[in-house]
Amino acid sequence: MQKILLMVDKISTRAGQISAISVVLLTALICWEVFSRYVLSNPHDWVFDITYMLYGIMFMMAGAYTLSKNGHVRGDVLYGFFKPRTQALFDLILYFIFFIPGIIALVYAGIDFAAVSVAINEHTTQTANGPPIWPFKMIIPIAGGLLLLQGFAEIIRCIVCLQAGEWPKREHDVEEVDVDKLKAMVSHEDEKKGA
């Protein structure tokens, strides 16, 4: 069971890492457009459309990645004091009441939304010669499907935690820098040099 959970985590992590490229593309595109507009006096109409599409891709594809890292915001005022079994019970109830129905609705509506867009070869209407928007709209059901897959993995994690009394391990990825640990490490290094 743990292998399956880690495999789903890995899929979500890879999808998040691949979509993180949109941050680099978005930054480069905005920098180029600022240079082109103010230095070359040659702005491009389509850049606005592409930037909001890249921004949307970044956030839609980050959902499953964030869920796989248990990184979504939650009210930890009481939750953090609960034992793992109680946490798992609350999570399990909330996954079935809110998460699964909401994500299924997202995928269902997203498939129709994308299919219509592909069928009519939809282009953006923000600019006169807007780029095609159907590739962007196809991301909606894909991101929803990845989020649903990760949600099922989280439900399995809750069930395992209810049985075992502790949370199963997650796939490790690059973590945020813990400032306190970093300060302690630097002060420890400074103490070594001073001694």
Descriptions of predicted regions:
Residues 1-195:
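Alpha-helical transmembrane segments and membrane-interface helix-loop junctions
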